[in-house]
Amino acid sequence: MNPRGKVRIIAGEYRGRRIPVAPKPDLRPTPDRVRETLFNWLGQWLDGLACLDLFAGSGALGFEAASRGAARVVMVESDAAVFESLEKFRSLIGAQAIELVRGDALEYLKRSRERFDVVFLDPPFRQNALPDVFRQLPGAPGTRVYVEAGEPFTPGAPWHELKRARAGQVSYQLFEWRSDDQGGLPGNV
């Protein structure tokens, strides 16, 4: 974690703003270098796109997406103190594109069924939540999913890995739903 308890937004409207990180042992804010790589993979700007930050944590990915022009960013967080920190920062910067949802990530997917252009998945490593998330994640051709985990993850068809890298103890990957595999995973048709 950042020693000062803050992580900075790299580019866009909120560039240079520092997101306060709640003092929670399980929070691992995505480092600047990894976020820079991710947004290079995504094409830097997310103008007009709908994004989901399913395990929001520090909010680094969701706030960065909003800063880079995403039309809508839904950030889901279950921890009350972390959620409160996200709310305060959203109000401070006036990020109208961000919708905060307090609750369980898997329950959100069961209820919402909304499709997003870009999904950020950085669950606590010990939860092993990725298989369940991918089973429930509504996708469509072109949907991109960023995964941050302790080890590389393979979700299977219709998801195709576009990029993969490693930074220290973290593996990060970018997947895309490909239309040549119509039918998809259970619950994603």
Q: Where in this protein do the model-derived segments appear?
A:
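Class I S-adenosyl-L-methionine-dependent methyltransferase catalytic core
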Residues: 1-189
